[in-house]
């Protein structure tokens, strides 16, 4: 991935929407930053209360439960989110950060001991999986199971098989938590109450399904793309190493430009119009996160990766009520990785790469890497 692309620029600047055929429907993707944020807050017009239809393509064939709380609108969304939000915000606590730092250090030890390392499956996937054990407060050994699922839980030719494996695994986790509750994420849900009643198993699965499927691609993709950029742009790596205080803004810029989720769906309860495109009741639109992040009316030189960019009002973690529950965790992992690279690596050399491209009827978008191999050199004495 040698340069950024923007397949939405022309439509964003002229029409404001891109008509995208998916699964027999033509879904208008909202492209402009201001309009995406406005729609994300307007749940009366653009509703998330649509099980399986918020992701695009939809996931009726991949899971049996509504993902919580993302596939709901306020006030239900608000009340469900309140049950788990404190658990996810632990990612800001020093003890949590220290555990992530130790995982990063161990994986970096292994990377530096090798001549070369493949980043996507050989580094980013293990880091994401082991960091998730910290977030869910389960034994790190569980990560070995998750790593075995591969990079994309719900994608590829075996997506349905993987989805069933995930649901079977989650049911086993809840069975164990109910039999012997602890302080982990699964036990939290078995003990939680929603409006005076215990959660049922479908609700528990809805939370857990999102925790596994929602953030997996995002973190793996962001890690790989950040390392790929530092390998292909040594000046930017030197810029960070010269002053680690720059890492906070650099992390946000990486999240802005390396957005793995192109868009997300909303269902219109009533007839509406989106930049001249009529949408019937029950029809879908999508919020173009990736396009909004490249809107030149908001971001100066949007295709330039500026590690000191500020302000940086990207929408990579969503906007409004549905702001990503895992945002703090993603930021902690990214900052921990960048800090460790700056301290312990002098140079990252690109050895080989194979770009990952999202191909659709309406656009082709480079998403990062299917494979990325680099050589990391420690500082010379």
Could you tell me what each predicted segment is?
Residues 1-381:
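Cytochrome P450
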């Amino acid at each position: 991935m040698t340069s950024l692309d923007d397949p939405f620029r022309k439509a964003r600047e002229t029409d404001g929407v891109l008509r995208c055929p998916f699964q027999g429907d033509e879904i208008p993707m909202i492209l402009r930053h201001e309009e995406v944020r406005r729609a994300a807050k307007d749940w009366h017009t653009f509703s998330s209360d649509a099980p399986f239809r918020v992701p695009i393509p939809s996931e009726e064939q991949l899971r049996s439960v509504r993902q919580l709380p993302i596939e709901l609108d306020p006030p239900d969304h608000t009340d469900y989110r309140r049950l788990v939000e404190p658990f996810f915000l632990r990612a800001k606590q020093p003890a949590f950060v220290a555990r992530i730092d130790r995982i990063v250090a161990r994986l970096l030890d292994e990377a530096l001991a090798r001549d070369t390392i493949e980043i996507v499956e050989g580094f980013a996937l293990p880091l994401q999986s082991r960091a998730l054990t910290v977030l869910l407060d389960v034994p790190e050994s569980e990560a070995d199971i998750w790593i075995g699922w591969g990079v994309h839980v719900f994608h590829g030719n075996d997506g349905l098989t993987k989805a069933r494996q995930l649901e079977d695994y989650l049911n086993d986790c809840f069975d164990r938590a109910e039999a012997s509750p602890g302080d982990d994420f699964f036990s939290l849900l078995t003990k939680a109450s929603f409006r005076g009643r215990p959660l049922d198993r479908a609700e528990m699965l809805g939370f857990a399904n999102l925790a596994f499927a929602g953030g997996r691609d995002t973190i793996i993709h962001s890690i790989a793309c950040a390392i790929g950029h530092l390998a292909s742009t040594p000046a930017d790596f030197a810029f960070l190493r010269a002053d680690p205080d720059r890492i906070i803004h650099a992390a946000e810029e990486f999240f802005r430009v390396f957005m793995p989720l192109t868009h997300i769906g909303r269902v219109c309860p009533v007839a509406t119009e989106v930049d001249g495109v009529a949408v019937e009741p029950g029809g879908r639109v999508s919020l173009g996160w990736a396009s909004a992040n490249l809107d030149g009316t908001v971001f100066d030189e949007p295709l330039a990766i500026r590690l000191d960019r500020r302000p940086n009002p990207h929408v990579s973690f969503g906007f409004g009520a549905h702001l990503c529950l895992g945002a703090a965790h993603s930021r902690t992992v990214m900052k921990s990785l960048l800090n460790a690279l700056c301290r312990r690596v002098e140079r990252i050399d690109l050895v080989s790469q194979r770009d990952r491209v999202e191909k659709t009827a309406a656009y082709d978008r480079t998403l990062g890497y299917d494979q990325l191999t680099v050589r990391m050199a420690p500082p010379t004495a």
